């Protein structure tokens, strides 16, 4: 019973141990070991071991080295000796001795975690006493602590080597980036190079540099994270203000100094001559490179994520200086850079000489050529110091300024004179002197997009809807010879003031300005009459009168510009001396008013408005001007009286919208749309061709060589025909049977066809109007020529006209004509049945009828649904 309870208890403990976390298992193991120690001490009556067994780790090692272990499973993962995971659970039973089997209680089997430090760390004791096991566990713990100490020392040494390398790289980068010119400061932030920590230089460098405190360590770690996002190499720049050559750039990884002694040695190697500036570049060998001409290393700016950023302009950086700094520095009238050497940290005023008259050359925005063969420079009137400018602005200032003492600048007075005369570059240069400290008086309306657009919109609205006062608009018009004046002055506070007289300026888009530039004695009326030219071309006046107004009444709209001044009546009106006032515009569409030399008002087609003779334009002329010329036949659109607007009936509106919806007409530009390919001459085509035949038959038949030349005498009863001596005018006249004179001529006249004949030259002239090539017309004539005597009868001419139309439709000429074509032009044939073609036509007609029926059905359904809802 006791054994059964113990077995149940052991199983219950094992289940609980399997569910407990690792810390609870360790505590349980420590408690079991303490109980085991107490029982062993009581059994053997031996003093306690000097080795402290109060820690769970020591007891764990002691249990691992015990030899009396039963049912020990093979641990998994023997290669990972330092792992602290569960390598295997073992049941351990440790008897106390030979005589204690009955007196001492049996220890409960507890799961023990076996941790193997290394193969050599396990020591097998020679004695089976608990003291030997504790000693072995203490030895294992001591050995493992030594290994841990060695690893910690290696890690500390590696960390110190990396920190020393970072110190050296930061010192070198700061030295090279202090005077970096032409690039933003973000280009020179030092990055963390990938260094070999096993090199002897890195190991020895830890002896020369003190370890930093914990706070500095944390700050440095944050700085390292920021540096690691950038590139792993830094371009070495010059040391004392000169710009590095693009071909002498060396990565920092190759020339980074190993310790502070190397840094001091490289800094002492820098030497600057007072007469000239030498550029020192840190390359692999440490030699200096002289650059006779400084060049700016242009590298694209990139964000930490790698995106390319457009670098800011140096001029923008100079202009972005805030006003409080400008007020503190003031202006310098000598146009020089004072304290230029203070822009470069670490250099004295003796190293760099003062530069006077330096500036940026301004080019024309039109062609990029310097004005007048001389460079217009911007005198820099600010005395800039390192206290005023930030490092980025200092770098931008040095990059933007060309250090050339020989460059000459223009004084402010000359710039003001050039600006007043209209020199664009001089005006820009004068504007850049004071930056934003410039006041403008007067506007330029044509250079303001919103104002120009508003004026165009108002013109368009006026042309469409009419209204407004013409005199106000014309009084504001600008004369052609107008020359704007711009004055630049200085107020009491020293601020530049630009005054312009271009208020309410409206420029004419005419090209006849040179004609009236020298005439200064023109008043307002003369300035308005000077637009009238002797030319009759309307295009010359479109630009001059594009902003003139016109009014509109109910009958028609009339323009207010005389474009036909060559008319003698209009010239007489212009030369009239009796006109002393203004005559109102006549709104009558059928008549106009004018004033002659005697002062009487007469009804003419002209009217006077502010002294300008104006001809009223009819509605036909205005519509004709807007119409587009085309070769196609313009259809006739029926017009309906708008009686429904007055009566309120809305049924006519639907008829107006759908009146021309289904109307079709013949389009000469697209004849195939109106063509029905039936293969014979239709009745409509035959009637059209017969009209041409009747009009042009019997013409110039006397030109034929076989036509008789004798005069034909006619009976007195045949007076209606009025025959002439020329036989060509005998339009089928028939002689009576009683007349036997000239039988040959009578027989000839009687042998002519009843419909008459047409000369081949006349037919050719008619067919050539189709613009078909002559060889094609010759083929058509050969197909239809049946008489072979230079003439064509009615059937031949009609078929020839039909073939010409077929060629215009795009069809090819057949090798021979089908008999049905000849039958279709016969006057006695009413209809020609073609089963194939007529079936196709009927099919098309049926489809059209079906579509119409479907539309009608849908319309009726919609109406029925609407009635149901109502």
From Swiss-Prot:
Q: Where is the composition biased (Acidic residues)?
A: 532-548
What's the name of the protein? Increased rDNA silencing protein 4
In terms of PANTHER family, this protein maps to: EH DOMAIN, GH06923P
Chain's gene name = IRS4
Instruction: Name its species.
Output: Candida glabrata (strain ATCC 2001 / BCRC 20586 / JCM 3761 / NBRC 0622 / NRRL Y-65 / CBS 138)
One Pfam match: EH
Q: What does this protein do?
A: Positive regulator of phosphatidylinositol 4,5-bisphosphate turnover and negatively regulates signaling through the cell integrity pathway. Involved in rDNA silencing.
Biased segments, Low complexity type: 167-181, 228-237, 567-579, 720-730
The taxonomy runs:
Eukaryota, Fungi, Dikarya, Ascomycota, Saccharomycotina
Q: What does UniProt give as GO cellular component?
A: cytoplasm; plasma membrane
Note the superkingdom of the native organism.
Eukaryota
